[in-house]
Amino acid sequence: MISFCIPSRGRPKLAKRLVDTATATQKHNTEFLFYLNDDDEKLEEYKDLLDEKHYTVGPNQSTCYSWNQLADRARHDIVMLMGDDVRVQTQDWDEKIKKEFSKYEDKILMVVPSDGREKGTLKFEIEEPTLWPDEPLPAAHFAVHKNWINTLGYLAPPFFWHFYVDTYTQKVARKINRCLYLPTVVFKAKKLFDDTANRVRSNMNIIKRDDAVWTKVRKRHLKADINELEKVIKNGSGR
């Protein structure tokens, strides 16, 4: 049904909570794909809490590279880019997400669950699935189909290290009118300021690096990705 791709470091209890809340509310069988770091001091705790089939251990690397490695391993057609801080709060969330993809023959769609935050500047109360206009949607986690991944060659744009992944992907999806906000599914998340978050924010100037990529190269890559996805939509079927 759905594969979760989740790089995780220093948060074994949160990783376990994600698995527990997703499985307690799923209708089908979710595939959990965690990427863990071999230099994480909490690695053994992960191994104690998670089923061995749910994780891969490797060197510390960019979050985007980890997301893409995990997406390549995903067995299910719908793939979710996830963080380890999520608590799944909606019963049959997987069936609800699948239902939205079933409405599109080509399966070119980005589904963005609610994370509990106010959405954009729209002046009406949104209660139903909504194709989002071309304005930012503050939610970091999303689902796409393998047709999307196979068309572009990646789940997370590989020219970023960690930041702007949701911003970039939403921009692509909104330009082709395929960014679907799904308020009927809640993946509760909040910004953390623990050692893991601080490591990403302070290590190797990652924020400024991704800022520069977003500022200098996004226009060319956006245009190319939009064109490729529009070709699939025009043809009426996925790859």
Map each language-model feature to its residues.
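Glycine-rich, basic loop-to-helix element that forms the pyrophosphate-binding segment
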Residues: 57-74
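N-proximal low-complexity "stem/linker" segments adjacent to membrane-targeting elements
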Residues: 1-21
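Short beta-strand/loop segment that forms part of the nucleotide-sugar
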Residues: 29-41, 56-57
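Short, acidic, metal-binding catalytic loop of nucleotide-sugar glycosyltransferases
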Residues: 20-30
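Short beta-strand-to-loop acidic/aromatic patch adjacent to the donor-nucleotide binding site
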Residues: 77-87
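C-terminal catalytic/acceptor-binding lobe
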Residues: 161-239
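Conserved donor-nucleotide/metal-binding helix-loop-beta segment in metal-dependent transferases, i.e.
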Residues: 91-110
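Short beta-strand-to-loop element that shapes/binds the nucleotide-sugar donor at the catalytic cleft/hinge
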Residues: 109-135
